Structure formats: C-alpha cells, structure tokens
Design a protein with these regions (language model features):
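Conserved hydrolase catalytic core segment
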Residues: 139-177
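Conserved strand-to-loop "acid loop" that flanks and positions the catalytic carboxylate
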Residues: 282-287
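Alpha/beta-hydrolase
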Residues: 187-278
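Flexible "cap/lid" loop of the alpha/beta hydrolase fold
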Residues: 167-196
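Conserved alpha/beta-hydrolase "acid-adjacent" motif
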Residues: 289-295
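N-terminal cap/lid subdomain of alpha/beta-hydrolase-fold enzymes
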Residues: 56-110
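Catalytic active-site module of serine/aspartate enzymes centered on a nucleophile-bearing elbow/loop
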Residues: 298, 305-337
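Conserved acidic catalytic loop of the alpha/beta-hydrolase fold
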Residues: 121-140
C-alpha cells in the first residue's frame, strides 16, 4: 500500500472527532512502512534547524493508531514487521500492540548530526510534523515509557487536539534532582573519555553506571549471588561481565554526542501537569529509583484528568521492559477506560 493510501485510511479513523470512538481492527495481515521526513523545526534551545525525522508505521491499516515512544535507547522499530522482521525494542508487548497501528520515530539527536541542546518538546513537535506529513489528523493515544513518557506529556500539552489520551509509564513532569545529578556524572564520564581519545571507553563506563539506576539492589542481590573473586591480582565482582556487556551495547548503539544530548534532554524536561488537557494514565513502578512513584503520584494529582496505577516490581525503572504481563494489563486498563 502506498504512503498516501495508508495515511488517508488512518486519518479517516480520526474523523470520529473528540469522542474518540474507535473499533478494534480485524485485519490479519499488518502492513509496515518506513520513511524520513525532512523539515525545518524551531528547537527550544537552538533555534531553527533543518531536521531529518526517521519514522516507522506498522500494524493493521484499519486499527486505531498509537504513537509509541521509549527511552533514549529506543528507536522507531517498536515491533518486528514486514519492513524489518528483527525484534523491536518493545517486542515483549507485541500481544497488546498488535491490536493497533503503531507510529514511532528515531529521536532527534540520535545519530542525525544535531549537536545542540534538545528539549522533550522538540521531540513532540517532531512527531507532530511526521503526523502532518502522513496526513494523520488525530490518534487514539500516545503511549510513552521513560523519556518517551516525558515526550508524550509535552505532546499532550502542545497538541491536545491530535490525540484522545496519553499513557505515561515511568516518566514524570520533571526529572528528579537525584536522577539529574547521576546523569550529569555520566555525561562528564563521556566527556572525559572523549578528551582522553577513548570515547568508547567513556561511553561504556557511563552506561554501566546508568544500569545501576535502571535496576535495583534487590534484583542484583538475587541475580548476582557469587562472591567477589580474585582474578590474578584484581578483584572482580559478579556483576562486572553483565555491566561490561551493557556498556558495549551502548557503544554499538550511540556515539558520544548523541548519548550526551539525549541525556541532557531528559534533564531539560519540564512541564506543568495542569497543562495536560487530555485524559492521562500514569503507570508507576514502586521500586523505580530514577522516577520515584511519589513524583508520578504528584503528576496524577495535579493533572486535570488523570489515573494512577502502581506496579510492584524488583526491576526498578526497567520494569516497563521486563514486567510484560503487569505492563500489558495496565495498558489494557488505560486504553479501555
């Protein structure tokens, strides 16, 4: 199916208007498309900029449309599909997401040559620009996790007329001061690596430090039970090989500038919950160190029309990737409400 035909069909769903009455799709053969939208965007902290926004659209063509966004490591490839059969970053939620047509983008600043401060609202405006290019007037919901939840909140505030609801998983109206402090150290590690002509080493170490905040002491205590051991004349802790593998994956995924700018973008994020004028479902994790459930409770209290669901997990911030059943059930509740 051509881009125009697919876009017109999705747009026709949005003609239902503010009531947002969508019917479940019964198409068994999903279609997928990828593209790049070139346009000029006014960036919050950097002014007018020519951008190339990489997008992917997949799922049954007559299904309600979701915008889906994850953490800074997430890409436009959410699920394996006809364009790319490899597993997407949220393949674990395939059972839930297959009911919908899914639109996602690669973040501004992710390997596209933009080396300037990027705000979460810039990402929201980039998604709106893609919707314009595809001829899509309105979507069923914006489902965001981690950084993607922050972008979803910005989208809801700036483009409320374009969606019926927003689901924010482990992403609040601001960054917690403890989390911002931790990320500032990570960025300094990356910068130090670059100064020492060891960019990859600095990036890998920064990611290893980040992993400690994504997970929890409880998970580590149950997962890494061996004692610290001497290898030659060096003490090695049982989690080191796991953390080193995480660091190497980050090196394969990011360049230093992209990692630094997207990390900054998390900390630059700020929005008044009162400005979110669409129904908001907030999903918190009780063990999340990066985005404490107290912050998400505040978001839900201050937003005009919000619902809060707290999931118990020992995975911390990464629960949105690991707690498949609990997250899927919460998503069902949010979008069926």
């Amino acid at each position: 199916m051509s881009l125009v035909a697919a876009s017109l069909h999705v747009a026709s769903e949005s003609a239902l208007g503010p009531a947002c009455r969508f019917t479940e799709a019964h198409v068994t053969e999903p279609l997928a498309e990828r593209g790049v939208h070139h346009c000029s965007l006014s960036l919050t902290h950097a002014g007018q900029c020519q951008v190339a926004i990489r997008w992917e659209l997949c799922g049954p063509v007559n299904a309600p449309l979701l915008i889906v966004a994850g953490g800074i490591s997430a890409t436009r490839h959410v699920l394996g599909n006809d364009v790319d059969s490899s597993e997407g970053w949220w393949q674990a939620q395939a059972h839930f997401l297959r009911r919908y047509r899914v639109l996602a983008i690669d973040w501004l600043g992710d390997g596209d040559g933009i080396d300037a401060p990027i705000d979460s609202r810039d990402q929201a405006n980039a998604i709106a620009a893609v919707l314009d290019a595809l001829g899509i007037a309105k979507v069923r919901a914006f489902v965001g996790a981690s950084y993607g939840a922050m972008v979803g909140l910005q989208f809801a505030a700036a483009h409320a007329h374009r969606l019926c609801a927003v689901v924010a998983i482990s992403g609040a109206h601001r960054s917690h001061p403890w989390s911002s402090a931790l990320r500032s150290i990570q960025r300094k590690i990356v910068e130090l690596g670059s100064l020492q002509c060891a960019e990859g080493h600095g990036l890998a170490l920064a990611r290893q430090l980040a992993m400690l905040s994504y997970r929890t002491p409880k998970e580590f205590s149950s997962r890494f039970t061996d004692p610290v051991a001497l290898e030659g004349n060096r003490a090695v802790c049982p989690a080191e090989s796991y953390l080193e593998a995480c660091g190497q994956r980050a090196c394969a995924r990011f360049d230093a500038a992209s990692y630094r700018r997207l990390s900054e973008s998390i900390d630059l994020h700020s929005i008044e919950p009162e400005s979110i004028r669409v129904p908001l479902s907030v999903i918190a994790i009780d063990s999340d160190q990066l985005v404490p459930s107290e912050d998400l409770a505040e978001l839900a209290v201050r937003a005009p029309d919000a619902w809060l669901h707290v999931i118990s997990s020992h995975y911390g911030h990464d629960a949105f990737l690991k707690e498949t059943s609990a997250i899927g059930a919460a998503l069902n509740d949010a979008l069926d409400a």
